[in-house]
Amino acid sequence: AGCKFAVLTATHETGFGLWQSDVNPYCLKAVKWKDGKGDIVRVFVNSCRKYGLQPGIYIGIRWNSLLGIHNFKAEGEGEFARNRQAWYKRLCENMVTELCTRYGDLYMIWFDGGADDPRGDGPNVEPIVNKYQPNCLFYHNIDRADFRWGGSETGTVGYPCWSTFPAPCSHHKRIESNVDQIELLKHGDKDGKYWVPAMADTPLRGANGRHEWFWEPDDENNIYPLNELMDKYEKSVGRNATLILGLTPDPNGLIPTGDEQRLKEFGTEINRRFSSPLAQISGQKKSLTLKLDKKQPVNYCIIQENIQNGERIRQYKVEAKVNGKWQTVCSGESVGHKRIEKFDPVEATALRLTVLQSIALPDIINFSAFSVN
């Protein structure tokens, strides 16, 4: 499918760990598989590197059904409960230390539901990640999120979608209490001071009203059809976000054949649509004209900014030259890393991008045209 990174759920709500933990006995040491010496995290990380994927780890510490932890909170009252709470915080910190120190550089560490507030019931994991994985993406606690959830588990984000945010994470004290948090997550804030780009997550088995993050038998008919995946791609990647697909390994630890086949089809279709532009141009200016080698049908264009310089474009329009005259085919606001515009097919000899509003000189690294059947 053209994925750049993969993230393994190393531990989830049961508390069971998929590695050889020295601090959490409820792990692969407790099973008969490989005589209790297996390490799925290591196998996963090694496989990612073998096949050119960046490895990440997803850590669930918000819930632990074995230990009776609910929303970071140990059950009970009084001194005994307070001692259990302190012990659980240390356990979580030690598990994070193990995962940060045993597997080399990690691309991302993702805490399910966040890692909470270390000044309260949450473990103090951010200093551990900073010390042992200083270059990884951190997601997230009450103080910091290197990217943000896009406001739904539909694999889409709203438009416009800005990578900037008014605070270093959602639900931060710097965000005014009357702000709609979900809308803010979906759209970001064009004037925000923090770079917190959006991600759009959804399970691959999410069709027909299902929403399966974990494997279920006889569930292959709920894999998203290709046309729905492409729609999600255009409404996530094409709106300046990252698309994250949840995959469900079966009891043998394998991605089922049907899921694998759909991912291959997905990657093939992305390449079919967008790997061969009719023409392409770049430049640091407010207007770019893309000349085609002949009159031909056009129904898509892609615009990309050099995000090393931030998001400068605030409003734009795209025109097509049809029978010698310019006519507007689409317009928008946010661009960022990538904006995919689909419009009614026109027979054109050129496309023209005009930036109508910007906060600095636009730095456009890609303006390209496509004809997609």
Give residue spans per PLM region:
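Inter-blade boundary loops/turns of WD-repeat beta-propellers
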Residues: K321-N323, V372
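Mature catalytic domains of secreted/periplasmic carbohydrate-active enzymes
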Residues: A1-A320, T328-F343, T354-D363
